[in-house]
């Protein structure tokens, strides 16, 4: 294992020296340490918004290592180097190692170079040193600390659990019960420990790790399979994991004890305050009840009715049975609460409770005595008054009962008889009202006897000098007057119902005839309005002529329709005449139809208004179709000429690009003259665009006079211009390539002939197989063996860098020119600079300005990096990196 030491002599550091160094090379242990240490680091790095994926790679530049130390220590380290060179990385790692050493840890055999080189052994050893110093060293249980302290803490916390015997930090944790016991000891609601089995370590470990990650914010540092599948789990990995549990739970017990002490004191104080509040409220409520009750008991004013006196007796009995006993209990409870409160205050060293003024126990006892005195004699007075009223109450009750029954029956009867519902009723409703009225007349006759009995009882009460005789007489007189009025209203309503029935029978016949004729006429008008307002969409003159003929036929039917309208309105006018003559209030409508005369007239007027609008619309559409036809013919005539012309030119360009002869300059001259002839044709295209704009504005979507549309013409024209421009550009590039690479005209012709030979589809490009055949024809030895395939793949990456699957002629020429001509290289440019620099490894600004033109000298000075070699002088520039950057071998 890694070598590290501390200035302190803590025992937890000593056993590490004796561990077998070869154990780290065990793949299972290394895997466990990688996962555990990575998770431990990420649990701290996430506080800074970052993490690591590969522990030996992500710490190589020292940046995240310094950030980790800042997070776990809470201190700032020296400013890191931001460069990407090895010297910068070593500097950053050394800063981190110096910080660890400043905390009293002696690092043995751990150097910055090994960390920067990604040495797994040294990196894991360094992280373990950090874990020991910042996560385990400060653990202290009784007289032990660090590793022994952590082990003792685990043993004490897991002691009550069966099947758990923690003796070390490797095999004692393999069955997973130790982790589960730690969680259950501190958070029993998270794990059902009784359901765990010692023979199922995978489930136990996964349960503990998942619960710790979800609820305790402890990341998963190991896989259960790695622990179970290893004879002796890695001790450092287990210690790291267990230390996370220690830090998660260490503060819980102290906080719980302090919270319990505070809660106990507060509970006693709150209980005493609640007892004080209860006493004050109970005393206040009881005194208020006594204050309200005494005046009620002292009130001896007699009542005039038996019911009122019985109610007083019942209220008094309710008071004795329901209201007073709870108050007696409250009074007793008040004294008990007072004594209990004083005892609790005395036992808890609190001052004695002093109730508010007037709420002492003695005050309550005095008020209670006054209440008892007021009760005396009240019940006997009540019984004597009841006997006195009992003699008159029976007869008065009989009068009230009969009067109430009669009044309940007559309630609403006058309003019902005064109703004029027959004025707005239909014929069927009138007949129903007559039947209902006959039933009411029978009921009215049956109530005559009760009215006579009410009058007799009222006379008897007057003779017996009843105290409430005036109200009895008034009620009796009201009943008699109402009875006479009901008789008169009944006769008047019968006459009105019979008269209305006859009028409605006549009106009903007229309504029926109106409905039979109005419905079909209304349907005809609605159909006519729909047809007249229908938005027609036509594209030819023939279609608009058909619509015009149909419209003329419709106008010929309007006179007969107007006669039918007048006949229907005549029926409605007859109904109105009857209503006005006999003053019938026609609140209802025609039961056979919802069509009104106003609706008929409104729709008829609308039809008359729509007819001339339809005439105008048809006339305008006819003129528009004639104009559209002229536009179609005009566009078709031009398109039928331009379309074939573009197609012919495209075919000619294709032949020219394949069959070009003579020198490249002759070909270029010929193509430019050809391009000029094409560009001169542009005014005709513009004129066609103007005609197309007119067609679009007229919303013309088809044209039988041509098969070409403007989109086809535009695409063809753009393709024509693009094709001629691309062909010219290819020839220009060929000239540039020829001049730059020294290719002869004969070689260029040979390349063109070979390319055209294998371009069998005349697309101007070669596929991979066509290109391969072309190279073979030119003498390249490309076999079908793996070496030949690799060579061909290299060539394809040159000629088709974007991996489009095709090779253009220009790419073909570029490749062939590189293969057949001399080219300058970065080494050649570098050698040239070295000559200018006097055989030095650097060059100065003065030398550049002396040897090169001014603009090119300034270009080099602005882009050359400072030279950093051991033989550097002030102002020295690095021409070597500049030369490689020119050819894409490094960044400029």
Swiss-Prot record:
Q: Does the keyword Transport apply?
A: no
Q: Where is the signal peptide?
A: none
The cross-references to PROSITE patterns, in alphabetical order and at most eight, read: ACTININ_1 (PS00019), ACTININ_2 (PS00020), CH (PS50021), EF_HAND_1 (PS00018), EF_HAND_2 (PS50222)
Top-level taxon of origin? Eukaryota
Which positions carry N-acetylmethionine? 1
Cite a single Pfam family from the UniProt record.
Answer: Spectrin
Residues bearing Phosphotyrosine are 12
GO cellular component, as recorded = actin filament; brush border; cortical cytoskeleton; dense core granule membrane; fascia adherens; focal adhesion; glutamatergic synapse; plasma membrane
Q: What is the effect of changing residue 32 to K?
A: Shows less organization of the circumferential actin-filament network compared to controls
* SMART domains from the UniProt entry: CH, EFh, efhand_Ca_insen, SPEC
What's any GO biological process attached to this entry? Answer: cortical cytoskeleton organization
Impact upon substituting residue 105 to I = Shows less organization of the circumferential actin-filament network compared to controls
Looking at the record, the residues that make up the EF-hand domain are 746-781, 787-822
GO terms (molecular function) for this protein are: actin filament binding; calcium ion binding; double-stranded RNA binding; integrin binding; protein homodimerization activity; structural constituent of postsynapse; transcription coactivator activity; transmembrane transporter binding
Kindly indicate whether the keyword Cytoplasm belongs to this entry. Answer: yes
Q: Which residues carry this modification: N6-acetyllysine?
A: 95, 195, 676
Record family assignment: Belongs to the alpha-actinin family.
Q: Oligomeric state and partners?
A: Homodimer; antiparallel. Interacts with MYOZ2, TTID and LPP. Interacts with DDN. Interacts with PSD. Interacts with MICALL2. Interacts with DNM2 and CTTN. Interacts with PDLIM1. Interacts with PDLIM2. Interacts with PDLIM4 (via PDZ domain). Interacts with IGSF8.
Instruction: State the name under which the record lists this protein.
Output: Alpha-actinin-1
Q: Which organism is it from?
A: Mus musculus (Mouse)
């Amino acid at each position: 294992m890694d070598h590290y030491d501390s200035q302190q002599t803590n025992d937890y550091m000593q056993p590490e020296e004796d561990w077998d160094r070869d154990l780290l090379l065990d793949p299972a242990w290394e895997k466990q340490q990688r996962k555990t240490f990575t998770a431990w680091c990420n649990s701290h790095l996430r506080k800074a918004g970052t993490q690591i994926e590969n522990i030996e790679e992500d710490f190589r530049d020292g940046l995240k290592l310094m950030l980790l130390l800042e997070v776990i220590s809470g201190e700032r380290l020296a400013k890191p180097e931001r460069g990407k060179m090895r010297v910068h990385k070593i500097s950053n790692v050394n800063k981190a190692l110096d910080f660890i050493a400043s905390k009293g840890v002696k690092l043995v055999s751990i150097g910055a170079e090994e960390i920067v080189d990604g040495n797994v052994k040294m990196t894991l050893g360094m992280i373990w040193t950090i874990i020991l110093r910042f996560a385990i060293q400060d653990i202290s249980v009784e007289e032990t600390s660090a590793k022994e302290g952590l082990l003792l803490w685990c043993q004490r916390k897991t002691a009550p659990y069966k099947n758990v015997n923690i003796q070390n930090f490797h095999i004692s944790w393999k069955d997973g019960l130790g982790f589960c016991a730690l969680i259950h000891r501190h958070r029993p609601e998270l794990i059902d420990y009784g359901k765990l089995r010692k023979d199922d370590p995978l489930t136990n470990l996964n349960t503990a790790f998942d619960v710790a990650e979800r609820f305790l914010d402890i990341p998963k540092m190991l896989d259960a399979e790695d622990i179970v599948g290893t004879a002796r789990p890695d001790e450092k990995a287990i210690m790291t994991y267990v230390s996370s549990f220690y830090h998660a739970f260490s503060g819980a017990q102290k906080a719980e004890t302090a919270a319990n002490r505070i809660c106990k004191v507060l509970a006693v104080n709150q209980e005493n305050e609640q007892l004080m509040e209860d006493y004050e409220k109970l005393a206040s409520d009881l005194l208020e009840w006594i204050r309200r009750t005494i005046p009620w008991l002292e009130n001896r004013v007699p009542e005039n009715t038996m019911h009122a006196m019985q109610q007083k007796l019942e209220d008094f009995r309710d008071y004795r049975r329901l209201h007073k006993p709870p108050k007696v209990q409250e009074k007793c409870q008040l004294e008990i609460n007072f004594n209990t409160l004083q005892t609790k205050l005395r036992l808890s060293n609190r001052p004695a409770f002093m109730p508010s003024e007037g709420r002492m126990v003695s005050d309550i006892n005095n008020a209670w005595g006054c209440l008892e005195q007021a009760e005396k004699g009240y019940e006997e007075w009540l019984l004597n008054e009841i006997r006195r009223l009992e003699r008159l109450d029976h007869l008065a009750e009989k009068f009230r009962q009969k009067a109430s029954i009669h009044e309940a029956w007559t309630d609403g009867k006058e309003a019902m008889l005064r109703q004029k519902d027959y004025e707005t009723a239909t014929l069927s409703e009138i007949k129903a009202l007559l039947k209902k009225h006959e039933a009411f007349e029978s009921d009215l006759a049956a109530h005559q006897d009760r009215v006579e009995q009410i009058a007799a009882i009222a006379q008897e009460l007057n003779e017996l000098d009843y105290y409430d005789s005036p109200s009895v007489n008034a009620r009796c007189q009201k009943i008699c007057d109402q009875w006479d009025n009901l008789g008169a209203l009944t006769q008047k309503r019968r006459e009105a119902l019979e008269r209305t029935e006859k009028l409605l029978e006549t009106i009903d016949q007229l309504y029926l005839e109106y409905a039979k004729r109005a419905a079909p006429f209304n349907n005809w008008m609605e159909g006519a309005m729909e047809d007249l307002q229908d938005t027609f969409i036509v594209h030819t003159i023939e279609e608009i002529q058909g619509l015009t003929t149909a419209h003329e036929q419709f106008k010929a039917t309007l006179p007969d329709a107007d006669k039918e309208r007048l006949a229907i309105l005549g029926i409605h006018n007859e109904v109105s005449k009857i209503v006005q003559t006999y003053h019938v209030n026609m609140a209802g409508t025609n039961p056979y139809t919802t069509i009104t005369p106003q609706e008929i007239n409104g729709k008829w007027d609308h039809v008359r208004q729509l007819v001339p609008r339809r005439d105008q619309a048809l006339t305008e559409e006819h003129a528009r179709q004639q104009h559209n036809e002229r536009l179609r013919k005009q566009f078709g005539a031009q398109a039928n000429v331009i379309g074939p012309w573009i197609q012919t030119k495209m075919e000619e360009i294709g032949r020219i690009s394949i069959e070009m002869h003579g020198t490249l300059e002759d070909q270029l001259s010929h193509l430019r003259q050809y391009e000029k002839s094409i560009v001169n044709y542009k005014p005709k295209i513009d004129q066609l665009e103007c005609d197309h704009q007119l067609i679009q504005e007229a919303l013309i979507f088809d044209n039988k006079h041509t098969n070409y549309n403007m989109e086809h013409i535009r695409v063809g024209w753009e393709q024509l211009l693009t094709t001629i421009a691309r062909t010219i550009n290819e020839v220009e590039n060929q000239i540039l390539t020829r001049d730059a690479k020294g290719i002869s005209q004969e070689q260029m012709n040979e390349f063109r002939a070979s390319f055209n030979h294998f371009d069998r589809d005349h697309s101007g490009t070669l596929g991979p197989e066509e290109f391969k055949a072309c190279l073979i024809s030119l003498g390249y030895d490309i076999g079908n063996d793996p070496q030949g395939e690799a060579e061909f793949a290299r060539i394809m990456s040159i000629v088709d860098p974007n991996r489009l699957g095709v090779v253009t002629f220009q790419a073909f020429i570029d490749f062939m020119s590189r293969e057949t001509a001399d080219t300058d290289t970065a080494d050649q440019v570098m050698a040239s600079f070295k000559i200018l620099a006097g055989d030095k490894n650097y060059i100065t600004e003065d030398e550049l300005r002396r040897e090169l033109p001014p603009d090119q000298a300034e270009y080099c000075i602005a882009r050359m990096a400072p030279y950093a070699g051991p033989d550097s002088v002030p102002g020295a520039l690095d021409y070597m990196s500049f030369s490689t950057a020119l050819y894409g071998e490094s960044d400029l």
